[in-house]
Amino acid sequence: MRILYGIQGTGNGHLSRGEFIYQLLLKKSTQIDVLLSGDNYSLTPSMPIKYRNKGVTFVINNGKIDYLKTLGNLDLFTSYVEQKNIPFKEYDFIITDFEPITAWASLRYKIPSIHISHQASFIESKVPRPESRNILGEYIMKYFCPTNDYIGLHYKSYGPSISEPIISSDILDFNSKVRGHVSVYLPWYDDDYLYDFF
């Protein structure tokens, strides 16, 4: 089975999860090609990246999508040209981690597909949301990456298609001593913004 795995390049979470899933996929298939869409990450991928696409990368400002800057950053022509060089029809299965190019290609070419990401969990109505709902955000979560099926990743299961987060065994097996200190990773927030909370 030939698999195309699309990974969103907005942040490190998609990429680190992608590394873990890629290793699991190698146990089932040796024909896995990775498409990395966008370039807003700081990790260096260890898996081979066959396709790179400018893609649709969200601009984040203080933990929220900046829709105007995201629109200004779009280069749909370049993204379209890059997609023309990807032989989607040669794949038997498509997996996407909130990556729209592979998701939409799976529908266009009728290739079985699955969306695995935290964002996919918001397809389920039982997943908690803020009191003031962001209608555009809800729409993006539901329709940005349409696939045949999905597995949402959340802190607990709110439905049959939601699993707990994927965490590498290196982290799970790490023997740490808290000693009254907890570090929180919030890369999308400016330090000045966070000082008000801490």
Residue ranges, per PLM feature:
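Structural motif
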Residues: 2, 92-93, 149, 181
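Conserved nucleotide-sugar phosphate-binding/catalytic loop shared by glycosyltransferases and other
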Residues: 5-9, 30-78
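A short, glycine/small-residue-rich beta-strand->loop->alpha-helix junction that serves as a flexible
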Residues: 6-19
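A short, Lys/Arg-enriched amphipathic alpha-helix followed by its capping loop at the start of a domain
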Residues: 21-31, 43, 197-198
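An aromatic- and histidine-rich active-site surface loop
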Residues: 42, 94-109
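Conserved nucleotide-sugar donor-binding subdomain of glycosyltransferases
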Residues: 64-93, 100-101
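Active-site proximal beta-strand in glycosyltransferases
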Residues: 108-124
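A nucleotide-sugar donor-handling region in carbohydrate enzymes
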Residues: 124-192
